[in-house]
């Protein structure tokens, strides 16, 4: 029986929902189950064969009917509308009490019991283990191995399997159904099996974001991320989760933990130790079964720093997250001869010989890995369950008392204090050298007083909680922020009345997030800045790149105003049971009057887009003004109150939780408002899909911007002004020179196929933006009145069109400029603070400073003639230490470098966004820079900046 999943809201409902499972045990346990070969016509792992998602679902339904060990549930829909399924596999006896097992794990995970009861629940309990596959769809092993694993767990009756089924509840989930369907169909479409390939798929293998689907798990923009997180952090609470990936390091078969440093300082040490233990179980079982070629730690670049992957988010929820990266493809692959992988060492204990590696062998390796995890989860289920409780208890205790998180900046502060003491002692005649004081070899350690005065400085203690005031200008975005926390299982409260904490009064409706909760690590990681260590292998060496970004706390990047509270506090707070919408407030406009929406509010653009679509008038104020006792900044939106506009305004305000004021007269004076008009937007993309373009596509859809995707062939054909008013080029679209290739291919990687090798429907998307052919057409477009918005590397267009700018990140060597070497400058994926000229219409609604995301991004210096040509800086780095979260080696080189440039070109406008203002659709705090740019060129009369001083020239 195939059952639609129903979320259990209480134990009684859970038991009622589980009642059909008891009936299911009456099914025949000795009946033969359909094998993959009987279902599909081949064994899983056969050369040149892949199962697609439609076939997978049919097979799961059949096994669900045949087996008393498995129940299939739907956990939600994908972005393309497919059902996402989880197979719950355990013994028939456990199926009878599934609700009780689930409830016991919930109580342990949330530390809702005392230690004695927790130990009893752990002794009597069952480990819940999540195993997934297929997240990155061109990594086809992950999805296919899941089919084989499900079949074996339902059919094998050896003692180990029976013990595993008795001690564990296994959640097998295919986490990118849309991608599996696309890639498998693409591979199998080729009639000549020897020509089959997973390369060259025509679009992203997740509808919007391709490979970045594994970077979305704290933000949860995509439905697949929401589905998985709900299961793991709000419903089932697995003790271990296992995320299958490809491909293994060259010269090896697979990577499995332990991971390399650094690990994130927010999560419990039991996480790191648990990862190492489970990873060691994988390596040990592989070696025992004669499966060589597994590496660990420095054998690959993976770490546990970044929160946003499906397995890394688990660390901040007290779950042991395991990643493997394994080679294997239905088209046989070859293990290359890599000399460094042949000498055994701690991180490469069991080298493998080079040679052909079959897909079936990769399946067997994957099943071994699964069994290694399930075996240790079974044998040590009491430890895993109690440790899950213990980590939750530790988190609650840490949030309930003074606590200090030690990170590199605190160590550096202590080091400076010790060196200062040592220098003072040396001047006084005491024989205390700096090396001894710092704990060097032969020394007696550092002065203990420094531990208390610096590492435990009372001013530097962790917050007991955070308050997000409801009177901040963009409260709807603040509400989106707390909703991401709620969707990740974090407890959030809302004030039912005004209250005072630490002498400051907060209005009703403010959000409160206390640190004393089981998922405290996630709370701290989302609010507090990351402090990544200087990962430099030797003095003077180049920094070792992180696996992903280093600074990402969304309280900063979303532009949230919040307060850190260092002491315990309470107030008139109610716990929010689920995601919320901010309270809307619409003040009626008098007859002949107008509505005003604050320019700070991102969701104002939803209202603007709906109104313009309905052919209603919208304008923007060009100077600050006051209505009903409330101050509004320049750029605020003015909407004449009509029978047509009023219901649109009221509806969008209710949906988004916006405040809308009614007023009698539209402000004019010396700065009359400018009228907006609907614009025709073209968003660049190319064959295979661009992840930055996909993210932007999703963002435009959420804020209801009308747009068309435009491909290089259309751009090269010219006559662009007849089709578009605004063109948007994301990172990776416009090269600096024609030898440079943009992104493309499956998931946003790789090259493009020959036209005659792909279906005709995809051929119009082939091609690249080129300096020689495309840029001249873009020049015509902007000179004839169009607006071009460029992001990241696509700001190269500024150089192509001759703007008076130069690269800020260069040095002069032997009389010639060259990019700063990595030994001197390296800023990988961090949050920096930038100054903003918010008198410029491009920055309407922004504060005078902003947190911006920066990932080795372009930065500019303006030439002396820039001002005369109307080229203006909109954002720049004002100082030698702009880093606010992450890692910035050599950040002093950014001092006064310009991040955002606005320039007139002919009758049109060109905007250079050096930093990625919509990176992975996380930095809500800079979205409006992009949105303002879309309407900037169409405003009539054209708005202009009102401030001309205090900006870099």
Please annotate each region the language model reported.
Residues 1-4:
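Positively charged n-region of N-terminal signal peptides that target proteins for export
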Residues 7-16:
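Bacterial N-terminal signal peptides
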Residues 18-22:
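Sec/Tat signal peptide C-region and signal peptidase I cleavage site
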Residues 23-168, 209, 215-216, 221-223, ...:
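Intrinsic-disorder/low-complexity accessory segments
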Residues 135-137, 173-179, 219, 248:
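Acidic, glycine-rich active-site loops and adjacent beta-strand->loop/helix elements
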Residues 160, 168-215:
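Divalent-metal coordination cores built from histidine and acidic residues
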Residues 172-176, 187, 243-251, 794:
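Short, solvent-exposed turn/loop segments enriched in Gly/Ser/Thr/Pro and often Arg
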Residues 242-243, 728:
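N-terminal Rossmann-like NAD(P) cofactor-binding module of classical short-chain dehydrogenase/reductase
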């Amino acid at each position: 029986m195939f059952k639609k999943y129903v979320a259990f809201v209480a134990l009684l409902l859970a038991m009622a929902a589980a009642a059909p499972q008891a009936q299911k045990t009456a099914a025949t346990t000795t009946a033969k189950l359909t094998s993959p070969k009987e279902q599909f016509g081949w064994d899983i792992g056969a050369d040149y064969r892949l199962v697609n998602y439609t076939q997978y679902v049919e097979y799961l339904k059949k096994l669900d009917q045949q087996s008393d060990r498995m129940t299939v549930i739907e956990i939600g829909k994908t972005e393309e509308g497919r059902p996402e399924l989880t197979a719950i596999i355990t013994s028939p006896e456990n199926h009878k009490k599934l609700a009780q097992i689930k409830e016991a794990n919930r109580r342990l995970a949330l530390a809702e019991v005392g230690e004695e009861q927790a130990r009893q629940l752990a002794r009597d309990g069952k480990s819940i283990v999540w195993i997934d596959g297929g997240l990155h769809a061109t990594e086809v092993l992950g999805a296919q191995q899941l089919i084989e694993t499900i079949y074996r767990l339902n059919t094998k009756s050896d003692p180990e399997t029976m013990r595993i089924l008795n001690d564990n509840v296994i959640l097998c989930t295919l986490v990118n159904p849309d991608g599996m369907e696309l890639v498998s169909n693409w591979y199998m479409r080729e009639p000549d099996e020897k020509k089959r390939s997973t390369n060259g798929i025509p679009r992203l293998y997740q509808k919007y974001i391709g490979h970045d689907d594994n970077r979305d798990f704290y933000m949860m923009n995509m439905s697949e991320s929401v589905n998985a997180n709900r299961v793991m952090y709000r419903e089932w609470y697995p003790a271990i989760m296992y995320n299958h990936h490809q491909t293994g390091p060259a010269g090896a078969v697979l990577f499995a933990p332990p991971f390399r440093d650094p690990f994130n300082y927010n999560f419990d040490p039991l996480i790191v130790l648990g990862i190492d233990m489970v990873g060691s179980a994988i390596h040990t079982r592989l070696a025992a079964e004669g499966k060589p070629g597994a590496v660990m730690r420095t054998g690959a670049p993976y770490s546990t720093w970044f929160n946003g992957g499906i397995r890394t988010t688990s660390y901040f929820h007290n779950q042991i997250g395991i990643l493997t990266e394994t080679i294997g493809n239905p088209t046989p692959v070859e293990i290359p001869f890599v000399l460094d992988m042949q000498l055994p060492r701690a991180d490469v204990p069991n080298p493998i010989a080079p040679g052909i590696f079959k897909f079936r062998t990769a399946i067997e390796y994957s099943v071994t890995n699964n069994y290694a995890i399930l075996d240790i989860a079974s044998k040590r289920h009491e430890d895993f369950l109690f440790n899950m409780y213990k980590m939750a208890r530790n988190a609650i205790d840490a949030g309930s008392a003074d606590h200090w998180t030690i990170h590199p900046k605190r160590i550096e502060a202590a080091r400076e204090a010790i060196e200062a003491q040592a220098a003072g002692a040396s001047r006084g005649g005491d024989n205390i050298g700096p090396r001894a004081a710092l704990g060097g070899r032969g020394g007696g350690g550092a002065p203990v007083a420094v531990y208390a005065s610096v590492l435990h400085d009372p001013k530097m203690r962790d917050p007991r909680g955070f308050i997000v005031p409801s009177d901040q200008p963009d409260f709807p975005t603040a509400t989106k922020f707390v909703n991401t926390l709620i969707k990740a299982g974090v407890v959030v409260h809302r004030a039912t009345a005004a209250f005072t904490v630490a002498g400051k009064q907060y209005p009703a409706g403010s959000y409160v997030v206390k640190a004393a909760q089981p998922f405290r690590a996630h709370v701290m990681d989302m609010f507090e800045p990351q402090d990544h260590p200087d990962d430099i292998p030797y003095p003077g060496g180049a920094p070792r790149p992180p696996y992903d970004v280093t600074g990402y706390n969304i309280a900063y990047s979303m532009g949230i105003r919040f307060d850190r509270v260092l002491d315990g506090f309470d107030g008139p707070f109610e716990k929010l049971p689920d995601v919320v919408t901010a309270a809307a407030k619409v003040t009626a406009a008098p007859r002949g009057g107008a509505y005003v929406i604050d320019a700070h509010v991102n969701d104002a653009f939803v209202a603007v887009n709906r109104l313009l679509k309905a052919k209603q008038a919208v304008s923007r104020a060009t100077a600050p003004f006051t209505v009903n006792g409330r101050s509004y900044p320049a750029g605020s939106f003015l909407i004449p109150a009509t029978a047509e506009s009023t219901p649109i305004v009221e509806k969008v305000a209710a949906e988004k939780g916006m405040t809308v004021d009614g007023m009698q007269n539209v402000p004019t004076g010396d700065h009359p408002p400018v009228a907006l008009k609907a614009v025709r937007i073209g968003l660049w993309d190319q064959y295979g899909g661009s992840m930055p373009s996909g993210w932007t596509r999703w963002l435009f859809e959420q804020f209801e911007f009308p747009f068309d995707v435009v491909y290089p062939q259309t751009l090269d054909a010219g006559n662009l002004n007849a089709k578009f008013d605004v063109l948007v080029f994301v990172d990776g679209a416009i090269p600096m020179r024609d030898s440079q290739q943009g992104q493309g291919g499956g998931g946003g990687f790789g090259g493009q196929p020959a036209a005659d090798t792909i279906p005709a429907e995809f051929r119009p998307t082939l091609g690249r933006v080129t300096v020689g052919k495309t840029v001249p057409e873009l020049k015509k477009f902007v000179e004839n009145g169009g607006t071009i918005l460029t992001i990241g590397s696509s700001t190269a267009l500024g150089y192509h069109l001759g703007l008076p700018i130069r690269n800020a990140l260069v040095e002069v060597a032997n009389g010639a400029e060259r990019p700063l070497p990595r030994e001197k400058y390296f800023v990988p994926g961090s949050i920096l603070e930038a100054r903003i000229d918010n008198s410029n219409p491009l920055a309407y609604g922004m504060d005078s400073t902003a947190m911006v995301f920066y990932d080795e991004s372009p930065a500019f210096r303006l030439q002396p003639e820039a001002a005369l040509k109307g080229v203006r800086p909109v954002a720049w780095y004002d100082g030698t230490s702009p880093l606010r979260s992450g890692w910035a080696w050599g950040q002093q080189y950014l001092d006064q470098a310009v991040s955002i440039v606005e320039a007139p070109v002919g009758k049109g406008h060109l905007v250079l966004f050096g930093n990625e203002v919509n990176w992975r659709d996380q930095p809500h705090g800079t979205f409006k820079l992009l949105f303002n740019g879309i309407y900037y060129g169409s405003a009539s009369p054209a708005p202009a900046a009102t401030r001309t001083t205090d900006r870099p020239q």
